[in-house]
């Protein structure tokens, strides 16, 4: 997986919000735990082994450091990156679609005889990272993304563009690079178009062709 960019300042705002929440939680936890921790400290003063530990370093202070704001922030951000951003109400605010899943459908390319072929697109996504892996059973090849960017049009349409490199298992087949643009028709339907620098004898030029596809996400995609 690789990082992807977003054409609005939402990530910076998320960081600020999570950090403020972390400070608040840290203050509350320190306040709630201060009395029992002081009580425990008094109790263990008479225990020889624990007295030695207390001489080496203040164990209780170390425990309080563990629940400090930076540690809480790291935990919350990890949780947000993996799970929270996909929750319905949070995602409505973020406006970044959750594309995780297996998408299948048909694609058509200007390469060769403009034949239609089967396409499967596997998308893995967190709040920070994403990957697109497209496989084409009819042609025995696979494309993998290497960069991506979300952008929202002025009319509210959500799109994502990603660069890719295509590799084939056939020795005689060439490797080539290209770019995809996906448009979300609905939560479980996407339409895409692409272009690449693959040699295209049909056009009588050294390289370049384009295509389009329509994919639907499986029932267990999310």
Task: Give a label for each model feature.
Residues 86-222:
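Central antiparallel beta-sheet cores of small beta-barrel/beta-sandwich binding domains
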Residues 1-98, 109-110, 214-222:
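Amphipathic/hydrophobic helical signal segments and adjacent flexible N-terminal regions
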């Amino acid at each position: 997986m690789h990082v992807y960019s977003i054409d609005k300042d939402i990530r910076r705002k998320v960081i600020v919000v999570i950090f403020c929440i972390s400070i608040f939680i840290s203050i509350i936890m320190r306040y709630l735990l201060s009395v029992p921790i002081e009580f425990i400290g008094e109790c263990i003063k008479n225990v020889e082994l624990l007295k030695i530990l207390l001489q080496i370093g203040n164990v209780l202070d170390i425990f309080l450091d563990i629940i400090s704001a930076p540690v809480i922030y790291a935990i919350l951000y990890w949780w947000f990156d993996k799970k929270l951003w996909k929750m319905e109400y949070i995602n409505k605010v973020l406006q970044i679609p959750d594309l995780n899943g297996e998408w299948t459908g048909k694609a058509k390319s200007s390469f060769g005889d403009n034949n239609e072929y089967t396409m499967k697109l596997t998308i893995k996504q967190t709040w920070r990272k994403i990957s697109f892996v497209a496989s084409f059973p009819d042609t025995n090849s696979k494309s993998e993304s290497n960069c991506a960017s979300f952008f929202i049009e002025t009319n509210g349409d959500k799109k994502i563009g990603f660069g890719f490199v295509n590799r084939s298992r056939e020795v005689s087949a060439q490797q080539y690079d290209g770019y995809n643009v996906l448009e979300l028709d609905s939560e479980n339907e996407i339409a895409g178009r692409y272009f690449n620098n693959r040699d295209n004898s049909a056009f009588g030029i050294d390289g370049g062709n384009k295509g389009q596809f329509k994919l639907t996400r499986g029932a267990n995609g999310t």
